[in-house]
Amino acid sequence: MIGIPFHLRPPPGRTLHSLVRTIASTKPADLSGTQDKSTRQKINFHELKHPSKVPQRPNKSTIDGQSTPTRIPVDTQTVQLLERLSLVDLDSAEAHRTLEDAIEFASQILSVDTDGVEPLNTVLERERLTLREDRVSDGKIQQDVLRNACVTEEENFVAPPGNIPLEQEPRK
């Protein structure tokens, strides 16, 4: 009965079902057991001093107050290579800006001093993990699994590439 206000606790012998009916029939203000309607206030969330910790606009922050890194231009050849490797179409100007912003954000990590910091292999480094012995087994279900695929080639699943349609129109 922890967390249920005292005045809502059932007397001995009452069932959980009757308790649920009692709670369902009470008003939300009565559930707290401390506030009444005269002291209850409506909160305007737009007038709070700190309404949200999440910024409403992008924040060009820096690490340790250093100047913002210079913008790294991405040439067309690099964009084409990234498109080919990632199978994602970066042809629009917005995608190009997003890529440059991501590179600028990630380049901030270069200014972090990591001398004397040991690499973290796992967050559970100090925990003893019991692992089972690895046994190689194909399970003899390859054909059953491949029957789930719409398209297979050389006993492999065929999936559409990224956000590029399979039937692509030639570029102008």
UniProtKB/Swiss-Prot annotation:
Keywords: ATP-binding, Ligase, Mitochondrion, Nucleotide-binding, Protein biosynthesis. The keyword Nucleotide-binding applies. It catalyses: L-glutamyl-tRNA(Gln) + L-glutamine + ATP + H2O = L-glutaminyl-tRNA(Gln) + L-glutamate + ADP + phosphate + H(+). GO terms for biological process: glutaminyl-tRNAGln biosynthesis via transamidation; mitochondrial translation; regulation of translational fidelity. The keyword ATP-binding applies. GO terms for cellular component: glutamyl-tRNA(Gln) amidotransferase complex; mitochondrion. InterPro entries: Asp/Glu-ADT_sf_sub_c (IPR036113), GatC (IPR003837). NCBIfam families: gatC. Subunit of the heterotrimeric GatCAB amidotransferase (AdT) complex, composed of A, B and C subunits. This protein may be expected to contain an N-terminal transit peptide but none has been predicted. This is Glutamyl-tRNA(Gln) amidotransferase subunit C-3, mitochondrial. The lineage of its organism: Eukaryota, Metazoa, Ecdysozoa, Arthropoda, Hexapoda.
